[in-house]
């Protein structure tokens, strides 16, 4: 039986290669709700609770370093020890997203436990037909009140890379250019507002054309215009409204170079 299982995994690896998104393909970022992408779209990013788009390279968004909004009750019931608490015992929340609590990644044991949960989510993404995963909040240590470090993030990221590749999924480095994601094993990058913060060069040096750049309307249109002039012919650059709402919803914006 063990031999057959090993043989099956070997065959699966040969049949389902790990492939990064098409370099420079037109991408759409649909985290606020799924909708039919425009015909020109080659790549779409959707939440792990959604379905992939048939015929379009689909990336599965997973909040891997913090709790997903609306799931804190599940974590409290099932894995309370993986929720980061400060020295007074209070949950450490992302100030920008107070529904999200940081995961406690300070020990190898906790990182392994969190990675097992993420792998189950990755497996669900793969089973539904997604080709890649985007684990968010790699930079959670910068909001941890000094409780987490970049070393904790790197160690956990390596586990996520192994988990994704075991499921035959490519995996994205989400933001955090100060960490060399290529050395950690990431296959491509999803970079938000890198033109605004002058970080895009760090991503293209690491990943070449395998970069999906998202600029947001609340920063104005100039950053998007500059990004298109600088990189629009080489990497995926798109403009979205901050809430990434579905098409047909008030405030919806989607532009590409």
PLM regions and their residue ranges:
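Secretory targeting and sorting signals
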Residues: 1-20
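Glycan-processing catalytic domains of CAZymes
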Residues: 15-257
């Amino acid at each position: 039986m063990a031999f057959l299982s090993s043989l099956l995994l070997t065959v699966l690896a040969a049949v389902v290669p790990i492939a990064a998104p098409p370099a420079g393909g037109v991408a759409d970022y649909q985290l606020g709700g799924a909708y039919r992408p425009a015909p020109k779209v080659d790549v779409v990013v959707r939440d792990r609770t959604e379905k992939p788009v048939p015929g379009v390279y689909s990336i599965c968004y997973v909040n891997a370093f913090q709790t997903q909004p609306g799931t804190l009750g599940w974590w409290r019931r099932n894995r309370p020890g993986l929720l980061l608490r400060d020295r007074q015992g209070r949950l450490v929340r992302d100030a920008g997203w107070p529904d999200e609590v940081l995961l406690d990644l300070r020990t190898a044991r906790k990182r392994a436990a969190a990675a097992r949960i993420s792998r189950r989510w990755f497996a669900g993404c793969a089973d539904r037909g997604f080709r890649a995963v985007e684990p968010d909040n790699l930079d959670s240590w910068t909001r941890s009140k000094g409780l987490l470090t970049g070393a904790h993030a790197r160690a956990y990221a390596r586990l996520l890379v192994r988990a994704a590749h075991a499921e035959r999924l490519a995996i994205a480095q989400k933001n955090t250019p100060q960490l060399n994601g290529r050395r950690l094993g990431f296959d491509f990058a999803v970079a938000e507002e890198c033109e605004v913060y002058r970080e895009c060069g760090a991503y293209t040096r690491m990943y070449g054309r395998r970069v999906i750049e998202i600029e947001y309307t609340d920063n104005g249109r100039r950053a998007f215009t500059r990004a298109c002039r600088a990189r629009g012919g080489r990497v995926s650059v798109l403009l979205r409204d901050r809430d990434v709402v579905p098409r047909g919803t008030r405030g919806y914006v989607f532009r590409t170079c």
